[in-house]
């Protein structure tokens, strides 16, 4: 087959470093009967070693040229190809059994894709993703740091996350202009409390971080007032990045009990 030309509109940077590939597969630790879904298999850097360990693998791919290449290289009884956009894909449709999801995620859609994947937290055992290093730093950030934000709160509410591997630009072809890393995400329901209305929690967090430099008192106007915050022992003069995930959950539940809905 002719050499595939990476397509910028799909955010294609193909992994080619053998030690990084081995590190990712080791982290995923696939067992023969696992139901594994790979997002964006590309030229098969992770696909091939996964297939060597699995009875069957599912992949989600949007690029028609890559789909044809995958069909030519792998038998259908080993590889199921789901053609389409991962942002719109129903991962739960693959199997009723627990899922493992892995992928070198396109950096140009990483944040919306992470929010989409987070909705499957109750269907997965773990997820491992290659992402822009700065995105992973936001995912695992601590309160009162510049990286702590909406993405942090909503993902840490659902998952335990760990930055497990640094990946330099030269590990890819073509090399991206940024450093990359690999994150492990393990569902951890209830680790930061349980929201009675997750849509309300999402609304609260989104509004709180709408203007990072403003205080909670200002950002939450129309949703929560100073009295709501003070009732929970939260200083209305704090900025949103100062508030731990647990306090966002407590505030969402307080507002829910007063009749607010997402």
UniProtKB/Swiss-Prot annotation:
Catalyzed reaction equations: adenosine(1518)/adenosine(1519) in 16S rRNA + 4 S-adenosyl-L-methionine = N(6)-dimethyladenosine(1518)/N(6)-dimethyladenosine(1519) in 16S rRNA + 4 S-adenosyl-L-homocysteine + 4 H(+)
Coiled coil segments of this chain: none
Keyword S-adenosyl-L-methionine: yes
Protein localization: Cytoplasm
A Pfam family per the record: RrnaAD
Top-tier EC class: transferase
Disulfide bridge map: none
Gene Ontology MF annotations: 16S rRNA (adenine(1518)-N(6)/adenine(1519)-N(6))-dimethyltransferase activity; RNA binding
SMART domains listed in its UniProt record: rADc
GO cellular component, one term: cytosol
Primary location class: cytoplasm
NCBIfam families listed in its UniProt record: ksgA
Function: Specifically dimethylates two adjacent adenosines (A1518 and A1519) in the loop of a conserved hairpin near the 3'-end of 16S rRNA in the 30S particle. May play a critical role in biogenesis of 30S subunits.
The protein's name in its UniProt record: Ribosomal RNA small subunit methyltransferase A
Gene label: rsmA
């Amino acid at each position: 087959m002719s050499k595939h030309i990476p397509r910028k509109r799909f955010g294609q940077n193909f992994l080619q470093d053998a030690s990084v590939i081995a590190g990712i597969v080791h982290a995923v630790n696939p067992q023969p009967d696992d139901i594994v879904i790979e997002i964006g298999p590309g030229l098969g850097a992770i696909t091939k070693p996964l297939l060597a360990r699995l009875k069957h693998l599912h992949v989600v791919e949007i690029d028609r040229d890559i789909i044809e290449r995958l069909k030519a290289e792998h038998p259908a009884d080993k590889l199921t190809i789901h053609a389409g956009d991962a942002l719109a894909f129903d991962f739960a449709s693959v199997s009723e059994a627990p899922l493992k999801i892995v992928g070198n995620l396109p950096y140009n859609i990483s944040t919306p894709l992470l929010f989409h994947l987070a909705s499957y937290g109750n269907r997965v055992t773990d997820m491992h993703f290659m992402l822009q290093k700065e995105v992973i730093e936001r995912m695992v950030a601590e309160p009162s740091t510049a990286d702590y934000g909406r993405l942090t709160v909503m993902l840490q509410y659902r998952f335990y996350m760990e930055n497990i591997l640094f990946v330099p630009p030269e590990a890819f072809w073509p090399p991206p202009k940024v450093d990359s890393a690999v994150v492990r995400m393990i569902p951890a329901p209830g680790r930061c409390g349980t929201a009675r209305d997750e849509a309300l929690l999402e609304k609260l967090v989104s509004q709180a971080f709408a203007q990072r430099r403003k205080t909670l008192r200002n950002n939450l106007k129309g949703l929560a007032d100073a009295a709501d915050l003070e009732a929970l022992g939260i200083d209305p003069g704090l900025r949103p990045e100062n508030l731990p995930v647990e306090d966002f959950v407590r505030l969402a539940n307080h507002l829910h009990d007063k009749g607010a809905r997402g």
